[in-house]
Amino acid sequence: PTGTALYTAAYRGGQQALGVVAEGIATGAPADLVALDAATADAADGDRLLNTWVFGQGVTVNRVWVGGDEVVRDGRHVHRDEAASAYRVVLRSLLDELR
């Protein structure tokens, strides 16, 4: 299958799971969006760009919005630092318990 076919199937499956019948981006509609870094897209366009992205051949995800909220900016999760800090605290606690 092509990237376009896989993307379309995932898109339709998501619509079905959410009970959404609207097509495309519209005011008030639920939206999860991905912005790719054009510099890593190797001048691909259309189907070729989608194939490159779906099959993971070097296209960098630059920004992501979930439910309209930006969760990835410049390739990094917006709460990455907080999550890493919380992880370190929990890891230290677990290691202390093992000693």
Language-model segments: residues:
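Active-site microenvironment of metallo-dependent hydrolases
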Residues: G3-R99
